[in-house]
């Protein structure tokens, strides 16, 4: 996330920014192809979870707000979005489902948008896989996305109905990084690990006391999810 992107404010800065982004993209992805798009100021990053089956049906499973980021990479996600209105949710959900149907999409996927301060939304990309932040969707609609993608692959049809949140969930990504060194990776030994628990708390992680975080991979080592009746309660649980 965030690689090969540059904001250009002045025409005279264009060539240097283009060359820099091309070099970064080539190094990161082995592909330096570039394109230009409108820069959306004060955006929110809101994505729609969808699922499609082998029989021409698709539905959406609500949105996730992923606007809290560093270096264009997600840190905190929540659902439902505090910025969302029922009208915007319906419009974005309809657009996401339409996109899935247009390519006969099978499986779970995420259609990602930027939303400006006037609630105009712009398509960014579609992730044709399970997302890091999928647990918050599972928690608020009681829907197992991993199970669903296996069933869809096995030829089981979906109902085709859209799902809407009954609860509020927040996910914090737990990263082995040093915030005092511009979030530089911080590999090493976890000497002691004590994870939180209780009602409305979910921890997804592979680490344990004595685990050594390697320097070779992404810095994320866990996800902490809180679920509650309201956003305020979910935030309070996360603070605790």
Briefly describe each language-model feature range.
Residues 1, 7-240:
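ATP-dependent carboxylate activation and anion-phosphoryl transfer catalytic cores
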């Amino acid at each position: 996330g965030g690689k090969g992107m540059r904001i250009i404010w002045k025409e005279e800065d264009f060539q240097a920014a283009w060359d820099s982004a091309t070099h970064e993209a080539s190094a990161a992805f082995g592909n330096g192809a570039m394109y230009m798009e409108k820069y959306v100021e004060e955006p929110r990053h809101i994505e729609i979870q969808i699922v499609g089956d082998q029989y021409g049906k698709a539905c959406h499973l609500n949105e996730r707000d992923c606007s809290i980021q560093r270096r264009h990479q997600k840190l905190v996600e929540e659902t439902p979005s505090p910025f969302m209105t029922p009208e915007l949710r319906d419009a974005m959900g309809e657009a996401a489902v339409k996109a899935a149907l247009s390519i006969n999409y099978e499986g779970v996927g995420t259609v990602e948008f930027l939303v400006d301060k006037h609630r105009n939304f712009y398509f960014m990309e579609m992730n044709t896989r399970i997302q890091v932040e999928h647990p918050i969707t599972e928690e608020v609609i009681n829907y197992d996305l991993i199970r669903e993608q296996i069933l869809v692959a096995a030829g089981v049809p979906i109902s085709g109905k859209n799902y809407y949140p009954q609860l509020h969930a927040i996910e914090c990504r737990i990263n082995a990084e040093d915030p005092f060194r511009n979030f530089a990776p911080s590999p090493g030994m976890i000497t002691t690990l004590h994870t939180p628990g209780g009602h409305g708390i979910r921890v997804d992680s592979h680490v344990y006391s004595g685990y050594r975080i390697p320097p070779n991979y992404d810095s994320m080592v866990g996800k902490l999810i809180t679920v509650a009746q309201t956003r305020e309660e979910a935030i309070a649980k996360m603070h605790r």
